[in-house]
């Protein structure tokens, strides 16, 4: 086993303690589309929606599906969803309602609405979760890191002093201190 001045070094495949994350199995196996308890009616889907896209599903769903889909906010042109595989606690996705993968396809009013959503939700998170900063990002295309290249979405990643600890470095894992459902409750309460 390799060691460092700070102890054993994490090596892929070595016998280590395990952190169980059973909610990731469907994603890893490619079968997790975030289906709500009740299907979204076909007539609710927007034109050109991708029925396999969780952001299109969130855009088409009614408020009764918001909790199970992680939707914390909507406007006439956008939807705000909790990232189910977050980089940090409070990681949100801000997406246009329509399924499109390029900025060129967005109208000026959509761009303005998306930017206003980023401002609003940074403020909500800062107040509700006392975050000290944010990383905001947009990955355009699969080679740029987009996990859903067909549906634009901005990441809001809250940050705190000392929020990255030894776990990612030594064990290759991140520890998130709050369940996604508790986060949904906290953020929706903060916007009431």
Predicted regions and their residues:
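A short glycine-rich, hydrophobically flanked beta-strand micro-motif that places a catalytic Asp/Glu
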Residues: 129-144
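Active-site microenvironments that recognize anionic phosphate/pyrophosphate groups
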Residues: 1-89
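Short histidine-centered catalytic/ligand-binding loop motif
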Residues: 92-116, 171-176
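Divalent metal-coordination and catalytic microenvironments
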Residues: 53, 80, 96, 114, ...
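Histidine- and/or cysteine-centered catalytic micro-motif in compact active-site loops
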Residues: 58, 83-85, 97-99, 139-141
């Amino acid at each position: 086993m390799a060691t460092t001045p700070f102890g054993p070094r994490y090596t892929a495949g070595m016998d280590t303690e395990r952190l169980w994350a059973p909610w990731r199995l469907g994603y890893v196996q490619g079968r997790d589309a975030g289906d709500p308890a009740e299907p979204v009616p076909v007539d609710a889907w927007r034109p050109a929606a991708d029925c396999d896209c969780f952001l299109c599903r969130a855009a088409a769903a009614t408020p009764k599906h918001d909790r199970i889909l992680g939707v914390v906010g909507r406007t006439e042109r956008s939807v705000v969803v909790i990232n189910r595989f977050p980089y940090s606690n409070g990681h949100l996705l801000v997406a246009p309602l329509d399924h499109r993968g390029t900025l060129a396809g967005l109208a000026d009013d959509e761009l303005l609405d998306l930017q206003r959503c980023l401002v609003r939700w940074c403020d909500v998170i800062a107040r509700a979760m006392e975050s000290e900063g944010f990383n905001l990002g947009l990955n355009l295309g699969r080679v740029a890191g987009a996990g859903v290249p067909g549906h634009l979405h901005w990441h809001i990643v809250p940050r705190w002093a000392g929020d990255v600890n030894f776990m990612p470095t030594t064990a290759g894992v991140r520890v998130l201190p709050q369940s996604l459902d508790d986060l949904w409750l906290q953020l929706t309460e903060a916007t009431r």
